[in-house]
């Protein structure tokens, strides 16, 4: 049942029992992963002095959107629970570890890191509170091993999606990655694409940027490229049950992409005969976008017009990006999002997207 209120000021998160689709625990360090590595990789980590793997597109040292009052708010499961889940009255929270694992060149090291991180998440986070859910880290550098990792966690429904980043080694629609999507679709995992870059390639069509702020704003191009690739290469027609969640992508750019891709498809569809319907229809059926950070107008009426161009209220999923700071009070429903859709965005859409997620009413 969707939540509707007369005044947005009355709508506090605690009244919704929301599911937060983008919460960040701290990234694991060597001492965290050692218990979950075999002897070979423990020796390798020590000899190569591998400790903490930052994703260079979002280095922890800069922390441009870190809340000063929440520096250690995600240090462990208990602290995250107290600072976020309890404070906001959340029904569940999806934990996303975005780290340098996504950028490791060695496919075997990446496989070991993903497996160890998943075990660490399961034992040190998911086991500590039944409201925690998580994204499964799999090595896109080694698709066969990634599919095996998905199979390994098929019966652990605390893991609800498979995670990668928006700007990786190649477009995600390539057949190289299809074993990952086949395993994910088979077991009800969504595919989650988070803002971030492995810097395998320059993040812009003109080369590398000079400043972090430039890298931040071109992330949207990375998301747009992946949407186009997944549609055009036929992933969504091959795996019709697969949902794709765009994390920290923004929202307002997608309607224009849907219109343009459908327009150009009408003239060039001879190249992709497996696409039998307009790309805009496929995108509305398969893609979902998280609400934080929202790139629309701060006025609710104007924001509703922008969201209306999606032509599908089911495409938005509630998120906070905690503990990152986007300049608003997390305890109150976001001003830019229509209050009439609060229940739809914060619960209904989440449950219909994540087939593996079960929560009490």
Where are these regions (language model features)?
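Catalytic pocket-lining loop regions of alpha/beta-barrel enzymes
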Residues: 125-133, 149-311, 315
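Mid-to-C-terminal alpha-helical segments outside catalytic/metal-binding sites
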Residues: 2-19, 27-92, 119, 123-127, ...
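Acidic-and-aromatic substrate-binding clefts and catalytic sites of carbohydrate-active enzymes
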Residues: 71-75, 102-103, 139-146, 168-175, ...
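Active-site loop-helix segments enriched in His/Asp/Glu that coordinate
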Residues: 100-126, 144-152, 170, 174, ...
């Amino acid at each position: 049942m969707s939540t509707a209120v007369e005044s947005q000021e009355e709508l506090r998160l605690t009244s919704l029992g929301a599911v937060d689709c983008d919460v960040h625990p701290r990234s694991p360090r060597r001492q965290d992963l050692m218990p979950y590595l075999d002897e070979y990789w423990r020796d390798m980590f020590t000899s190569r002095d591998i400790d903490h793997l930052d994703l260079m597109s979002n280095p922890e040292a800069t922390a441009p959107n870190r809340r000063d009052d929440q520096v250690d708010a995600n240090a462990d499961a208990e602290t995250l629970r107290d600072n976020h889940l309890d404070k906001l009255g959340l029904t569940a929270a999806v934990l996303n570890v975005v780290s340098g694992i996504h950028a490791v060149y060695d496919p075997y090291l990446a496989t070991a890191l993903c497996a160890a991180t998943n075990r660490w998440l399961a034992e040190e986070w998911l086991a500590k509170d039944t409201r925690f859910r998580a994204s499964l880290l799999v090595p896109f550098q080694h698709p066969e091993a990634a599919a095996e990792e998905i199979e390994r966690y098929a019966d652990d429904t605390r893991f609800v999606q498979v995670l990668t980043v928006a700007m990786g080694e190649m477009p995600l629609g390539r057949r190289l990655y299809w074993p990952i999507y086949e395993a994910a679709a088979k077991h009800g995992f969504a595919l989650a694409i988070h803002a971030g870059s492995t810097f395998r390639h320059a993040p812009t069509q003109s080369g590398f940027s000079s400043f972090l702020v430039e890298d931040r704003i071109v992330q949207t191009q990375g998301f747009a490229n992946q949407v186009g690739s997944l549609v055009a290469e036929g992933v969504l027609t091959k795996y019709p049950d697969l949902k794709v969640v765009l994390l920290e992508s923004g929202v307002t750019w997608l309607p224009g992409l849907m219109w343009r891709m459908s327009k150009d498809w009408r003239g060039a569809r001879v190249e992709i005969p497996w696409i039998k319907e307009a790309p805009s229809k496929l995108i509305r059926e398969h893609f979902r976008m998280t609400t934080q950070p929202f790139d629309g107008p701060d006025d609710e009426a104007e924001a509703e017009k922008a969201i209306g161009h999606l032509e599908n209220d089911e495409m938005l999923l509630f998120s906070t990006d905690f503990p990152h700071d986007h300049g608003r009070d997390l305890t109150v429903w976001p001003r830019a999002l229509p209050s009439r859709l609060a229940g739809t965005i914060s619960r209904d859409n989440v449950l219909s997207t994540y087939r593996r997620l079960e929560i009490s009413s």
